[in-house]
A protein has these predicted regions:
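Conserved Walker B catalytic segment
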Residues: 1-13
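Glycine-rich, phosphate-binding/catalytic loops in enzymes
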Residues: 2-5, 29-32, 222
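Structural recognition of the conserved hydrophobic beta-strand(s) that form the central parallel beta-sheet
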Residues: 11-17, 38, 47
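Hydrophobic/aromatic beta-strand patches that form the interior of the parallel beta-sheet core
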Residues: 13, 35-37, 87, 204, ...
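Interdomain motor-coupling "hinge/lid" segment immediately C-terminal to the ATP-binding subdomain
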Residues: 23-146
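Accessory nucleic acid-recognition modules appended to NTPase machines
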Residues: 97-268
């Protein structure tokens, strides 16, 4: 790569969902010749733009936020319907494109399930030694998020297994951008990293639409209709994790029997 850049005829872009893993395996990186940019699914604001929410409406939202005032009720109702749509479609570019082309949720789910199948192929291809562990963890994300405290319980994989045996599999899922670990902190005080627990965490999907695609068929329409019988906790919490992560913040949460729980704790200067 260094030679090609120095030759100067072209500029090069390398891309891939697992490029970060490949780069970490390099013995030396060509410092000064490569800029690394991490890409994310479309966030909620970008999704608003994709489905045609006008700049005027977006400005109204920002003004309301900055002035600590409620958004107009009609605007609020419309935006919440788009939020529920985002819970189903998510932000994967191919999925959003399919929705805009077809306006068909069944077509959307077909693309999402194809992406999930490709994840399994990538797991087997890039880490054959740990593929069973990684696949077990990945497949356990939806039911673990549906549990009361949403914390990932390692014993649900194997009662006798130790965290150290699975740790590299969690790291692999994080480094590939497939999953978003959110670590427990002993206290919601800065710096959060100093009180981070190594093995107490929640594990979210990197895209809320892919999480919704793992649910039973028919749930998607109930989400769109804001069905009061559905527990929206897991899917909304996944949405927040995705938003916080794509804006550059590390993911933490705080839980205390005496003080209560903070679903997310953000270190912001």
């Amino acid at each position: 790569m260094k030679f090609l850049v120095e030759e100067g005829s072209y500029r090069y872009i390398m891309s891939g969902s697992l490029l970060g893993i490949e780069m970490k395996d390099l013995r030396s990186a060509p410092v000064g010749y490569i800029d690394i940019w991490e890409m994310y699914p479309l966030d909620l604001e970008e999704f608003f733009g994709a489905v045609g929410v006008s700049d005027t409406v977006m400005d109204h939202i920002k003004e309301s936020w900055n002035g600590m005032k409620p958004v107009d009720e009609v605007v609020h109702a419309k935006l919440m319907s788009i939020v529920r749509l985002y819970l189903i479609v998510g932000g994967m570019p191919a999925v959003v494109e399919k929705y805009l082309e077809t306006n068909n949720l069944q077509s959307v789910m077909e693309v999402q399930k194809a992406i999930l199948r490709l994840y399994e192929v990538d797991i087997a291809k890039y880490d054959p030694n740990r593929k069973l562990y990684i696949r077990e963890i990945f497949n356990l994300i939806p039911p673990e998020l549906n549990a009361k405290n949403k914390r990932f319980i390692l014993k649900n994989l194997n009662e006798k297994i130790k965290f150290s045996r699975y740790e590299n599999s969690f790291i692999w899922l994080k480094d590939t951008g497939v999953a978003l670990p959110t670590f427990s902190v002993e206290a919601p005080t800065s710096p959060l990293a100093l009180s981070r627990s190594r093995n107490l965490f929640k594990l979210f999907q990197s895209d809320v639409g892919l999480l919704a695609a793992t649910y039973a068929d028919g749930i998607q329409l109930r989400i769109l209709d804001d069905d009061p019988d559905i527990n929206f906790g897991a899917i909304y919490e996944n949405l927040v994790a995705q938003e916080v992560h794509c804006h550059g913040f590390d993911l933490y949460y705080f839980n205390s029997k005496k003080q209560g729980e903070l679903d997310f704790v953000v270190e912001y200067e």
